[in-house]
Amino acid sequence: MGNLKSLVLLALLFSFSVAVFANTSNDATHDEVKPSTEATHAIEAQKHDGKPQIAEAQVEANDPVVEPQQDWGGRGGCRWGCCGGWWRGRCRYCCRSQAEASEVVETVEPNDVEPQQGGRGGGGGGGGGRGGCRWGCCGGWWRGRCRYCCRSQAEASEVVETVEPNDVEPQQGGRGGGGGGGGGRGGCRWGCCGGWWRGRCRYCCRSQAEASEVVETVEPNDVEPQQGGRGGGGGGGGGRGGCRWGCCGGWWRGRCRYCCRSQAEANEVVETVEAQQAKP
């Protein structure tokens, strides 16, 4: 009996030892596999913090670079001209070079220009400063037509305040008649380098060199041979700008750059202006 009790005690001790060893091994395995809660939070924080920094860097890289407005006048406030849109009479994107400016001019379609609406002026040709638009021209010019007409009187007034008086030479002459000296030059000292409205030049040449440059760019074939006089006395063609059916384009030194080819074309121009004037 004594030997039997001893064997039972040894068996119990062995079983207890095996159970304790198994529990110790399981605890060690769990400690190696599972990371601590603090380490997990630290890793997630690093992942989230990295995304805003990358997004901010991308936004800064995509920001457009706009050249500061350097001047004002026929070039839209840019050195070589405006190659982008307009906002309140200021260019959003200035041409970087003369080559880029020339490329933009070649791609300007007639439909890109808002239909000219006609000025409210009368008598003394008050609409000249309005550039053929109801409230004035707030953008650039192309072939004697405004690229962007002011949308309201307030916008036009804001543009007028930013234009320096020296940018446009005061109109000096009349509309011709008798021996009106300035009539042939459109009321300007060196000639008219812009469009016309009611017999007055919209933009006077700054110098003789600028006037000569404009003359060289006008192709003779673009202008129908002038058939009438420049006014004065009872010159029949004077009122039509020296054209049989009227002038459908710009003017230069009192002569039309593009004459209407037919009475129908002349009527179409008149109807367009009258329709725009009738709008509220």
Curated annotation (Swiss-Prot):
GO terms for cellular component: vacuole. Residues 173-184, 228-239 have a biased composition (Gly residues). Disulfide bonds: none annotated. Residues 1-22 form the signal peptide. Keywords: Glycoprotein, Repeat, Signal. Residues 163-184, 218-239 are annotated as: Disordered. Sequence repeats lie at residues 76-97, 131-152, 186-207, 241-262. The keyword Glycoprotein applies. Induction: Induced by cold stress. Residues 76-262 are annotated as: 4 X 22 AA repeats, Cys-rich. The keyword DNA-binding does not apply. Glycans are attached at residue 23. One of its GO terms (biological process) is embryo development ending in seed dormancy. May be involved in the acquisition of desiccation tolerance during late phase of embryogenesis. This is Late embryogenesis abundant protein M17. The gene is M17.
